[in-house]
């Protein structure tokens, strides 16, 4: 009974997984939703369903405008993950997840860089040189920003099939992954076996906002490119070049091939373009 009267928000705050930004966002949205007060006893199906509706209409925490449906889906999934922990630890009596519906995601057009745009980006100076190196490294390896920020020199090791690979614990999934990297990627970062510490020392996540947007604009690229677009660029260009989807899945450390297929949907449009390049009519 004492547990049920305890402060749920205090427990939630202690559970925040650094540097998992999504957990932090969900905590603040839930804090706003309950106006800063909530006990374990109040966590029931009705409250959770109301929080689901709140997320579908919630405003962004740091910017103007509402969160997207896909963001709401991700936040809701994270919150349901917490409910699972609560039930497993006997902090709530009912497995509430059994009574909650998912928030379905929407297919939305995702921008990526074409080969020509990647060349342009590589040729364009950036006011934050380490940001440019990190962005191009992501295009060549598919590493997420969270993994790039934490990447250490000692995690670059010999690959069994030859060359080098990144042997690391992926920040998002907390799984051990081995990701091969090309000689060009090694040259880009100035690899040397004697180096120690962070590979991208001094890089700040905040630079992926305004500083990166300025650099992309100066390269003459008008697409809405985020740092995650570089990972999508890797998948799309590998697919367009004929790399087997299972290989791409492995290199991107995707648990499910369905995830890889979502990244590569755009490749079908590349195939369509190719079909139109041969014609019997003079142009």
Give a label for each model feature:
Residues 43, 205-206, 222-241:
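Short basic/aromatic active-site micro-motif
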Residues 66-69, 73, 88, 92-145, ...:
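Basic, Lys/Arg- and aromatic-enriched nucleic-acid-binding interface segment
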Residues 112, 170-174, 252-277:
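Catalytic-site neighborhood detector that most strongly recognizes the C-terminal catalytic loop/helix
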Residues 2-63, 82-84, 88:
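Basic/aromatic-enriched alpha-helical hairpins
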Residues 182-222:
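Active-site/catalytic core of tyrosine-dependent DNA strand-transfer enzymes
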Residues 101, 111, 115, 141, ...:
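Conserved tyrosine-mediated DNA breakage-rejoining catalytic core shared by Y-recombinases
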Residues 136, 140, 147, 231-255, ...:
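C-terminal catalytic core of tyrosine-transesterase DNA break-rejoin enzymes
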Residues 155-162, 222-223, 243-262, 273:
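Short, polar N-cap/turn motifs at the start of nucleic acid-interacting alpha helices
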